């Protein structure tokens, strides 16, 4: 077992922390969010009765906050032993992590504000539990296992990946024939991407930026880099708050989609001359670079809503700056030689989870994403022989199962196909 200590042990060693009150506060947050997560409530009842995960060890690298914690405890209730750490150095809520670590079937190593060495030490600590299932947000754990612990690959049943960036990495790994066990691309299934990516990212990113800066969007030029599902959500929600939205893209069909939906579309260097607020959502690096910083207006706000901190090139911005200082909690101002100040939120990390006041996506949205995670883990265990190594789409019946639970919880009834309609859809002989 790793020498890196679970969070409870780390807090016990800190004489300035009241561990019990910290756990109590974390538990309070978890209970509040669970009230607004009917899918997880229903799955808790099912998993508690059938114990579909009995005997399994689940290793997780996720954003450790209240909503994630409810997924963790659902998995533990289903019979699994769970070890978890963060997937971003700034997204952990220590009180929630402490509450999780007090669960006898859960070990949490997640701690906010760790340096790079401690971040990877915590991942190693989770891997030391020898997981049979992995759940990742960004693919750092899958990478660590393949790179440093190939001896574990034969005993891992499979995994699930939460986010766009992680799925991109996994598909690249799969194309190189390096991925050695099956992983569900949770990000790509409709119950995740149509809600979490669009509404979750759009609402939480903009809400966090507004609360961090105490500024309005009305009348401002908001530049959205990338028009995938996340970028589309940011653009829609910004327009709904009376911002003038400009979209930048490298993919012609997405650019055309943004244009046909009424947004201005232009290259980043042109948008940089007009933007007041910049939000990157691409999952790629060097989206905003020196040539863009050089033409931005004084006071521009720069935020990243992609997984890693590489979309805004902070090395180049630092080289341009003659001074840096904390303008507000979570806002780093870079003063340039001509007196302009460019303001970067949350160190260029995932703003809706890494900013000091960030709470992540709304509970109702994450309820759907984490419901998919839970049924994917169950599917891997119950039908492990059906999945070869590689990236797999979430089976449609699992996506529908979660949708049906949500509709029932919302009190929404829908029609069902008649036998005649089903036969018609399955037939190829009916023409004009």
Curated annotation (Swiss-Prot):
Give a yes or no for keyword Magnesium in this entry: no
Required cofactor(s): NAD(+)
Where is it localised?
Cytoplasm
From the UniProt record, list the reaction(s) this protein catalyses. Answer: S-adenosyl-L-homocysteine + H2O = L-homocysteine + adenosine
- Residue segments, region Disordered: 1-24
Major location, coarse class? cytoplasm
Give its E.C. classification number. Answer: 3.13.2.1
Enzyme's top EC category:
hydrolase
| GO CC annotations on file | cytosol
Molecular function terms in GO for this entry?
A: adenosylhomocysteinase activity
* Pathway assigned in UniProt: Amino-acid biosynthesis; L-homocysteine biosynthesis; L-homocysteine from S-adenosyl-L-homocysteine: step 1/1
Keywords on record: Cytoplasm, Hydrolase, NAD, One-carbon metabolism
Q: Which residues bind NAD(+)?
A: 163-165, 197, 226-231, 249, 284, 305-307, 352
Q: Which GO terms describe its biological process?
A: L-homocysteine biosynthetic process; one-carbon metabolic process; S-adenosylmethionine cycle
Entry cofactor note text? Answer: Binds 1 NAD(+) per subunit.
Q: Which residues bind substrate?
A: 137, 162, 192, 196
Q: Which NCBIfam families match?
A: ahcY, PRK05476.2-3
**Role of this protein:** May play a key role in the regulation of the intracellular concentration of adenosylhomocysteine.
HAMAP family, alphabetically?
Answer: AdoHcyase
> Can you tell me which family this protein belongs to?
Belongs to the adenosylhomocysteinase family.
Listed name of the protein: Adenosylhomocysteinase
Give the originating organism.
Answer: Haloquadratum walsbyi (strain DSM 16790 / HBSQ001)
- Gene that produces this protein: ahcY
């Amino acid at each position: 077992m790793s020498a890196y200590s679970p969070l409870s042990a780390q807090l016990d060693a800190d004489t300035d922390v009241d561990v019990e009150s910290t756990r109590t506060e974390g538990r309070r947050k978890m209970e509040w969010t669970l009230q607004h997560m009917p899918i997880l409530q229903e799955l808790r009842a099912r998993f508690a009765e059938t114990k579909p995960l009995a005997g399994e060890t689940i290793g997780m690298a996720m954003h450790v906050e209240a909503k994630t914690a409810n997924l963790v405890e659902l998995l533990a209730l289903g019979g699994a032993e769970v070890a978890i750490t963060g997937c971003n150095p700034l997204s952990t809520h220590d009180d929630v992590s402490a509450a999780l670590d007090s669960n006898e079937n859960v070990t949490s190593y997640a701690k906010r504000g760790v340096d790079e060495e401690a971040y990877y030490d915590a991942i190693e600590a989770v891997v030391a539990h020898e997981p049979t299932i992995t759940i990742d947000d960004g693919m750092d754990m899958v990478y660590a296992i393949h790179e440093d612990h190939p001896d574990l690959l034969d005993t891992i049943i499979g995994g699930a990946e939460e986010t766009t960036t992680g799925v991109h990495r996994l598909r690249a790994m799969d194309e190189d024939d390096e991925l050695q066990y099956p992983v569900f691309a949770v990000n790509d299934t409709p119950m995740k991407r149509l809600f979490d990516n669009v509404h979750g990212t759009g609402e939480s990113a903009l809400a966090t930026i507004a609360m961090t800066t105490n500024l309005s969007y009305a009348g401002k030029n908001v530049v959205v880099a990338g028009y995938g599902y996340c970028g589309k959500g940011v653009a829609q929600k910004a327009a709904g708050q009376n911002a003038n939205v400009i979209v930048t893209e490298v993919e012609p069909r997405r650019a055309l989609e943004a244009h046909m939906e009424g947004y201005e579309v232009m290259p980043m260097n042109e948008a940089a001359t007009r933007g007041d607020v910049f939000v990157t959502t691409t999952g790629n690096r060097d989206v905003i670079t020196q040539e863009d910083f050089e033409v931005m207006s004084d006071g521009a706000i720069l935020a990243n809503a992609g997984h890693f901190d590489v979309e805004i090139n902070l090395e180049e911005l630092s080289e341009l700056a003659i001074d840096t200082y904390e303008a507000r909690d979570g806002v780093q101002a870079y003063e340039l030689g001509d007196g302009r100040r460019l303001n970067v939120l949350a160190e260029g990390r995932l703003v809706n989870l890494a900013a000091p006041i960030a709470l992540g996506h709304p509970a109702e949205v994450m309820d759907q994403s984490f419901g998919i995670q839970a049924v994917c883990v169950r599917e891997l265990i119950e039908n492990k022989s059906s999945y070869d190594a590689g990236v797999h789409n979430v089976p449609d019946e699992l996506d529908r199962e979660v949708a049906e639970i949500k509709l029932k919880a919302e009190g929404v009834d829908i029609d069902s196909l008649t036998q005649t309609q089903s036969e018609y859809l399955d037939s190829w002989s009916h023409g004009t």
